[in-house]
Amino acid sequence: LPKLEGIIKLNNKEKIFIKLVQVYLLEKNYQETILTVEKYEKLGYGYSKEIYDAQSIAYFRLGQFEKSRKVYEKILSMEKDKGESYYMIAESYYNEKNYEGAKEYYKKAYASTNDEKIKKDSAYWLIRVEDLLLNKTEVLARIKSFREIYPNSDYEEDITYLVARIYEEGNERKNAINEYAKLYEMSSDIHVKDDMAKRITELYTEEKDIKNAYIWSNRVSEEAYKYLWQAYIMELEGKNSEAIKNYEKIVNDKSYGDSANYKLGTHYLGKSDYKKSRGYFEKVLEFETSLNSERAQYNIGITYEKEKDYLKAVSSFLKIKLLVEDSTLDDLILIKLGENYEKLNDSNKSYEYFKEYYTKYSGNKDYAYVTEKLLVNRIQVKNISEMKEYYNELLKINPAAAKQYAEYIK
């Protein structure tokens, strides 16, 4: 590199500038690439596509997309086939998440080039942009056209997956299954085949198509997944004892053990075997990443509540309240804390959590129940003003319940 710089100083050869910017670009030294192009321009050399390509790519990789586009506009004014420049402008808009801008320039790229690769790539990315713009009808129309023009393209797997996903999102399960099955047959990648077999298994399970759910679950290479999902299928058939055996086989599996333990905990909770149930829920919490951990912690609290160990129940529910930000169970937790503090005869704490629910969840189904709890609490502590507030609110949402307390509001 120093040698090249020296040569420039000696003879200012245009071709050396070109070589130098290409070397800087290869080394990911984007600032030097840009500075070298600026020197090239100051020396008055004429148009060089290689020089400006390097400059625009350097700006692009630095995330300076507007500057990158300005360079491509220079190239556009000099080039007969404008497809590549239009395509790169589209790419810059895409990376800015300006999908309307990207759409406009992918269209221009497709229409203004004889380069078959740029045409095909532009057509593909138009599909992806329409998908991001949520134009599902347009996506499917473009895919139909793309498949007619490029029947065996290297994009076919991606397109097939996209079609399947659109069908699935539209609740067209059978069409989605057909597309996922095509992708399963098409792909030679074991991970893709596994993912497709799993998705098809799950869709057939949702459809309660037991036979096909079993067939596709057996095509998955992961034994633990087979045990888990076939247990779900067995439950649909009412074969609960067989399902339990399957869950027990994978309680220590890193990927699916948390789900198996959660299902076992739920099973024994339903059987009122609270200690055994709690053991499985506690095991769920041992997994570093688990979608079931919050609900498992909640159910641990339920087991203690069922055993009338209200202090431990409160402790379990508080773990979620204090440690889980934006908990999806927040409304349930507030009710459980209110109820269990009530059973511990701590009326202040009970009131605190019922009040929080009352303030946050006025549209929820348990709002009337909580309002009544607050009314009873205020009657017990003889707080007349708040008593009237909750009575009047209860009168609006559950008049029959409110009338039981009319004698206190005189």
Segments predicted by a language model, with ranges:
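Acidic, polar-rich low-complexity tracts and alpha-helical solenoid repeat scaffolds
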Residues: L1-K410
